[in-house]
Amino acid sequence: MFRTMSIARLLLVLALTPLAALAESPPQGSLVIIGGALRADNAAVWQRVVQLAGGAGARIAVLPGAAGNPERSGATLVRYLNQYGASAFVVPLAVRLKGRDYRRDAEDEALARSIRQSGGVYFTGGDQALITQALVRPDGSRTAALEAIWDVYRRGGVIAGSSAGAAIMSSTMYYDAKTVFGTLSQGVRDGIELTPGLGFIGSDVFVDQHLLARGRFARMLPAMLKKGYKTGLGIDENTAMVIGPQREVEVIGYQGALLVDLTQASSDPANKEFNLSNARISYLDQGDRYNLVTRRYTPSADKAEGKVDPAKPYMAEPVYSADILGHNAALVMMTNLIDNAQAEAIGIAAAAPGEPRQDLGFQFKFSRAPDTTGYASERSEAYTILGMRLDVTPLHIVRPWYSDWK
């Protein structure tokens, strides 16, 4: 009798135990990491979020805490998600939400229960520091609300986030970041430029966003070196990476993502300025897949038969950029080099007028390594680029760069 009651009691305890207590088991859910500036008509991304949350009528908890105006941002996101078939609702938890105590809200059991009963969670854009401020206790432990979010993820739900909501996906995130050039020229510090994220993707992958549009691929490099990351994923605007429980990355939406591999990279500590040798950088286009565990790449259907033949280059012109940190400059350079008779391409980064370190610049040298591979789409001019080498070296910049022609 005693044994029977003990087993029954154990089963009852297990049934009533929050999923947070089962933290040792890997999450069974998915991540949708969006690079910001997600358009309302980007059906591929919105529909995938709803699908992964459970399909038509799925409950999705919207956390607008990063936004400058949480009420307006939350209402907008709920409207978009519901247009694509969800049953979304705003979670009233935000540092800037007027008339509320975010510390109390983060520990409210009814609020946590509403999150836990959802099939998905969506973090809006804005300031990622406000997300962690609201969800993480001062001692670094998880609030009840954050545990509920993890419960959704563990049991198979989706965690989605755009811009700031993407930044919190890794265990380290940019916080009070300088410009991209300022980050290269002045470095990064723990607790100032870099702070802990929420870590949904795991401790081994660094995530950044607005990547190609704002030249942020370059700021991934010092952050990854500082924190010891070997793998980084950067997602561009109006585009998303979907990462399932098998850790396979699928790119959907408007453009693509960059995969940064520092496995064989090195930096010369004798040079006080930022420098990096033998990094590998890949561009994953929409429809492409990459498995973070097996490191296997699967091209989209329109590129499966389009492997670039380096013996038959399409272009022969030199490739150069005087502003490698500019809008889409890195992607343009990589695309123009992968199917080119030229072996390397050079991009220059320098301080903007009024920015510190006017005498300093950086050369970004992209080159094709023996194992660099490209795939061309049969439907568009898009390419996928795998394993292009990147070396970054400091330069001395002479001012002014130019004068009137006489």
Question: What residue spans do the PLM features occupy?
Answer:
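Catalytic-core regions built around general acid/base machinery
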Residues: 110-114, 141-156
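Glycine/threonine-rich flexible loop motifs
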Residues: 128-142
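Catalytic nucleophile loop
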Residues: 122-125, 148-149, 153-174
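Bacterial N-terminal signal peptides
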Residues: 8-19
